[in-house]
């Protein structure tokens, strides 16, 4: 308490004593009064005094106020007064207009009161429970008090909330509050809660924070919204920055797609308010958080692809090429586009296709490079363009080739109507502005990064320096400017370009050494004792000379490795050379540039090193040091071993290619076998359908035959019923003649039916052709068996190829062992003969195994040829099956035609039978008219046989009776 009293300093005793007594009396009322109204009025009075007499109220009343929160929860009014009073005691916001010393004292006072409050963790838990109250007068001051506690002692309060049951979940409900004041202050509370605490960030994210925050941003109008949008964006950054789990959750939840409307800035005349600029700036930063180069590569790549697929990258490029965009927004947009396309081939290709809305249209890359080499543009904008160009070329060999091609003579526009990227880079490289020199040199170096092909292509570039003089190569022009003693920034940029160009490119080293003035210039620069400003240039010259030694293929007799090392030892000294080489990594700006890919410098004079170049220095510094101290014999042995290993690599690569080709051939054969199998199945299906159709025709024929038999029986019954008793002789004679005629017709019909039966029998015999179908099915089965055999043989070939791959792996392992033994040999000269014997033995062994592999490959080719012949035979068999099926189809058509004819003839027979039935019916009617009884149809059927017998015994009996 004494410390807290001392914070406010010495003040007049009179008033302080009076206010202290008043505060004491109010505290006594709060503690001892039994009436709720008295306690409420006392707390309200303490609230009014707490802003002016913060120390006194805090010292005397804090304990009583906490007790009120515990005991009087049923009365929201007194709880609200108590929370407001505690907020006034702990918060420092009211002290902003006080002098600086007083402000510092008040901040200490707020921290002390916060420490007293959270000393009992139950107080924070109590405050969290009060936030569940929906009453505005309780929830709002509770939110403000907890926010103030987090601002004062954030980590301690975060830990208490983290271990409290449902602590974070209670706070998440604030985002769903319908009262904007509470919702907005809830966002501020979550900002303070999630700052620098990954565990709380994960809990908040999985409590559906992303969905709620994005909804608030959308409701408030996206970038056109107010400060609430700004607060939500800051909270989103807290949740996502350096938190891989939340970033992955954000991407998988498809929240990246919801960011696209943020960048629909609309009409350029709509204006850019300060709040809109701030909001858009934070939105761009949030995109960069998701694709930051410091994130895991897999997470960054997936976010980049999602941004392209949902159209976010396209929207950013629209802002990039728009007019009227504020400078800081344009700069941040360039940086954002840079990281969205960095290392992503699809995004880089799209960016290369973007054109500026000019007449004629120009590529966006060209427009940006024009800004980079223009010294009148802001420094931060030029840095952003350089970063964008670097990201466009990062791991993009296609883009590197396109940039270098604009420098080659065959692609330069002779009319001069358009400016290419290469022309702009050359213009910047040889400009009078040192910053343009440095930017152009670094940009061109990135076009050569890890791309030996483009390094060789760039050697073809010729520059016309002046009228009447022959053209000069770009490499020579760079060394000429370097030797003219220009500004340090220019020389550093050119030296970085030359080091990048010559590394891993012996042809470029040869071109560089071919100019006799280059080596003396470098040795002279290194040997001189210059000031601290020139030490960096000396270190870069030493690095360039070391690269010329390490990547030298000894094609120039006057500048072979050994001669260059002797020159260094004679003119510079090896120790001095290594010391100068170490100046690079010891420079204060080297470590700053090595941290991040983005060229972020406070001012132009700090723009010295490039991030990718620092990686090159780290890679080459050690090997150059070793190369300087190596003897000529060690170099020769190392070269021989390298050549041997290269030969082995070439042989292994050759056989890998052969095996790859064989794999392709086998895959083609598999596809062909699969195709033949499908065709065979189709043919079998067709044959089955034909057999079923023929069976249907047979069934139809049998049915027709049965129907014809029934019709004949019915006709016989009618004819026999015509023999009646009691008919006149002339009538009987006439009837007999008619019956005879009907019999003749019946015999004629019977003969026709017999012919039809014979025809149908022929049809039955023709159905024996179905055996051909069975034979075709047998052929198909044989085809299936042959296909299975082919599959088995292909599997055997595949296993043989796998064994060859294992052999090649063994060869690679032995090659690695050879390399290790060679390095061991380089360290120990005494075992020279033994090492050479081992290498020769291993080489012979490798060649023997490779010969065996070649023989096996030849056998595989023969087997593949045999498979091709078998496939041809299968195809011929399938063709014969097709012809058989065609014959079956023809015979089936003939059968169908004959069956149709037989149906027509049967219809004619039925018509004749109907006529006969009509005649018989008329005869029966005549007999009835004559008075002779006529038997019914059933009686006739039952007595057919008896009537036939009577007629045969006494044909004249009926006449006698009459």
From Swiss-Prot:
Post-translational modification (record): Phosphorylated in a cell cycle-specific manner; phosphorylated in interphase but not in mitotic cells. Dephosphorylated protein associates with the Golgi membrane; phosphorylation promotes dissociation.
InterPro entries: ARM-like (IPR011989), ARM-type_fold (IPR016024), Armadillo (IPR000225), P115_Arm_rpt (IPR041209), Uso1_p115_C (IPR006955), Vesicle_P115 (IPR024095), Vesicle_Uso1_P115_head (IPR006953)
Residues covered by region (Disordered): 763-783, 926-962
Modified residues annotated as Phosphoserine in this record: 50, 942, 952
Coiled coil: 638-930
Gene Ontology BP, a term: transcytosis
Region (Globular head): 1-637
GO CC field: cytosol; endoplasmic reticulum; ER to Golgi transport vesicle membrane; fibrillar center; Golgi apparatus; Golgi membrane; Golgi stack; membrane
UniProtKB keywords: Acetylation, Coiled coil, Cytoplasm, ER-Golgi transport, Golgi apparatus, Membrane, Phosphoprotein, Protein transport, Repeat, Transport
The ARM repeat ranges on this chain: 20-60, 61-121, 123-163, 166-207, 208-253, 255-310, 311-354, 363-408, 420-459, 473-513, 518-571, 573-630
Residues recorded as bearing N6-acetyllysine in the entry: 202
Gene3D superfamilies cross-referenced by the UniProt entry: Leucine-rich Repeat Variant
Location(s), subcellular: Cytoplasm, Cytosol; Golgi apparatus membrane
Chain intervals with Acidic residues compositional bias: 935-953
Compositional bias (Polar residues): 763-778
Membrane topology annotation: Peripheral membrane protein
Self-association and partners: Homodimer. Dimerizes by parallel association of the tails, resulting in an elongated structure with two globular head domains side by side, and a long rod-like tail structure. Interacts with MIF.
Family: Belongs to the VDP/USO1/EDE1 family.
Function (record text): General vesicular transport factor required for intercisternal transport in the Golgi stack; it is required for transcytotic fusion and/or subsequent binding of the vesicles to the target membrane. May well act as a vesicular anchor by interacting with the target membrane and holding the vesicular and target membranes in proximity.
UniProt free text on domains: Composed of a globular head, an elongated tail (coiled-coil) and a highly acidic C-terminal domain.
Identification of the protein by name: General vesicular transport factor p115
Species assigned in the record: Homo sapiens
Chain's gene name: USO1
